[in-house]
C-alpha cells in the first residue's frame, strides 16, 4: 500500500471564526497559526499548503499579561535615514487593533512562500461584524 501524500488542490479548506475578546494575545496566536498551517488535520504535511481560513473578531479587545500593555513596543522603519518609529501596545491596539494580531500570527508562521500563502488566509476585524457569511464559517471556542 502506498503512502498517502496530501495535495493542496484536493484538500477542502474550511472557514473558522475565533472570538478574540478577553483572550491572551500569544495563546490566541498559537491557535490561529495552528489552523492556518493545517496541523489540526490528519493529512498534515509540512511541504503542502493544506491549512484553513481563519476569521478573528473583536481584535480591539485582546489582552496581554503582566506589564506588556505599557512595556511591549512595536518598531517599524519608514525607509528614510533615522526613520525608525515605535509604538507601545496600548497605542497600537487603539490605532491599529488588527495589526497586533496579524504581527503576532505572522511571526509564528513558516518563513518563505508557503508561509506567505498561509498568512493570506487570515482575516482580522476589530469589531464583531465580518463579511464572510457566505462561506458559512464554523465557530471555534478556545480557552486561553
Swiss-Prot record:
Keywords: Ribonucleoprotein, Ribosomal protein. GO terms for cellular component: cytosolic large ribosomal subunit. GO terms for molecular function: mRNA binding; structural constituent of ribosome. One of its GO terms (biological process) is translation. Part of the 50S ribosomal subunit. Belongs to the universal ribosomal protein uL13 family. This protein is one of the early assembly proteins of the 50S ribosomal subunit, although it is not seen to bind rRNA by itself. It is important during the early stages of 50S assembly. NCBIfam families: rplM_bact (TIGR01066). This is Large ribosomal subunit protein uL13. It comes from Blochmanniella pennsylvanica (strain BPEN). The lineage of its organism: Bacteria, Pseudomonadati, Pseudomonadota, Gammaproteobacteria, Enterobacterales. The gene is rplM.
Amino acid at each position: 500500500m502506498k503512502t498517502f501524500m496530501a495535495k493542496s488542490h484536493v484538500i477542502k479548506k474550511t472557514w473558522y471564526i475565533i472570538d478574540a475578546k478577553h483572550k491572551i494575545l500569544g495563546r490566541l496566536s498559537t491557535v490561529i497559526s495552528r489552523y492556518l498551517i493545517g496541523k489540526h488535520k490528519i493529512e498534515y504535511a509540512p511541504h503542502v499548503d493544506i491549512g484553513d481560513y481563519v476569521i478573528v473578531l473583536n481584535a480591539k479587545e485582546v489582552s496581554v499579561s503582566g506589564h506588556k500593555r505599557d512595556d511591549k513596543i512595536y518598531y517599524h522603519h519608514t525607509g528614510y535615514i533615522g526613520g525608525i518609529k515605535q509604538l507601545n501596545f496600548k497605542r497600537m491596539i487603539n490605532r491599529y487593533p488588527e495589526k497586533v494580531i496579524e504581527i503576532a500570527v505572522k511571526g509564528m508562521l513558516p518563513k518563505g512562500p508557503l508561509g506567505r500563502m498561509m498568512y493570506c488566509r487570515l482575516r482580522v476585524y476589530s469589531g464583531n461584524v465580518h463579511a464572510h457569511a457566505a462561506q458559512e464559517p464554523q465557530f471555534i471556542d478556545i480557552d486561553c
